[in-house]
Amino acid sequence: MSKDSPLIALVAGEISGDILGAGLINALKIHYPNARFIGVAGPQMIQAGCQTLFDMEELAVMGLAEVVKHLPRLLKRRKQVIQTMLQQQPDIFIGIDAPDFNLTIEQKLKAKGITTIHYVSPSVWAWRQDRIHKIKRATNLVLAFLPFEKAFYDRFNVACRFIGHTMADAIALKPNRTEACQILNIDENQRYLAILAGSRASEVDFLAEPFLKAALLLKQKYPDLQCLVPLVNQQRIQQFEQIKARVAPSLPVKILKGNARQAMIAADATLLASGTAALEAMLCKSPMVVGYKLKPTSYWLAKRLIKTKYISLPNLLADDMLVPELIQDECNPENLAWYLGNYLADDIDNKKQQNELKQRFTDLHKMIQCDADSKAAQAVIDLLANSDDQ
């Protein structure tokens, strides 16, 4: 490559990957103003200067049934990416998340001498740990958001760099509740519970009912309690409203399209499904209860596959049960309301415990707030420099 104008390939498969890719491209352009970027990009990466082979939306399929339905097209697109990369011979290939799509591409390209990075570790530390061997074959380096992920890769001698989490960079160490309430157009003197029942239809199906019934129980004890319900799109809003009409028609709720972050900052407590939302709640310093339910067969399988003590990212980061995790049968209205009630109570002991919890959240926030875009860019620069020297 020309030292100051590398050809850098990136493939993102969904919106979150597009955001990461754009941040990385912008950070790389500081060091390489003349770099060229090609691959599969969404609107933000395109705006940052990446030429895309096809619309990223073609890869954004979720759930087994949807993947199976679109499999011939996905395989065709993957073959197209591999062929294009072998023709173009980029100086480095960066697969952003989407491991089922990207790892095979990375493996094929690495075998042909192209340097590869996988950006965002798959949850290989939690389940399907045998994937570590494919990751080792496929990548020159993994970029990990969380420190315990790097520790896992180190055990298997897989090159990995901890870069911190982009979400920790985006959220202030001391979130501004007044500003969040203004954005949501709500009274900051009111008591709020944020309810996040998940982004997938199946999650809302399983969790909306126990979450709403828990809120009804809390409303009896705290009549001034208001519920904030951020949902990702119009389909989830309609689905949630139908369930609410059946199980909690009298409960006053403010339904929001998006604005989950502001809802969690404004809320006195958050009730949520496990996943990235739990990490976001921690960064928002929102005391939370994590609830999750699956089909009985899926739960039976998950129990046997998942290898970690905890399921929520705050607890995994702390290696401690910082926040309650109520799974399957334990995820019932009475349990959820009892744990949430501890956060809403006004007595001195509970306030002290809340302050201690928020301090733990702040300490964890600092641990993963590392300017991830710059760290990721530096990892790319270092690998390019190494390949130049060889």
Curated annotation (Swiss-Prot):
Keywords: Glycosyltransferase, Lipid A biosynthesis, Lipid biosynthesis, Lipid metabolism, Transferase
Catalysed transformations (reactions): a lipid X + a UDP-2-N,3-O-bis[(3R)-3-hydroxyacyl]-alpha-D-glucosamine = a lipid A disaccharide + UDP + H(+)
One Gene Ontology term, aspect cellular component: membrane
An example molecular function term from Gene Ontology annotations: lipid-A-disaccharide synthase activity
Record-level GO BP terms: lipid A biosynthetic process
Entry superkingdom: Bacteria
SUPFAM superfamilies (alphabetical): UDP-Glycosyltransferase/glycogen phosphorylase
InterPro entries assigned: Glyco_trans_19
EC number(s) per entry: 2.4.1.182
Coiled coil regions, renumbered to chain: none
Pathway in which this enzyme or protein is active: Bacterial outer membrane biogenesis; LPS lipid A biosynthesis
Protein task: Condensation of UDP-2,3-diacylglucosamine and 2,3-diacylglucosamine-1-phosphate to form lipid A disaccharide, a precursor of lipid A, a phosphorylated glycolipid that anchors the lipopolysaccharide to the outer membrane of the cell.
Annotated family: Belongs to the LpxB family.
Name assigned to this protein: Lipid-A-disaccharide synthase
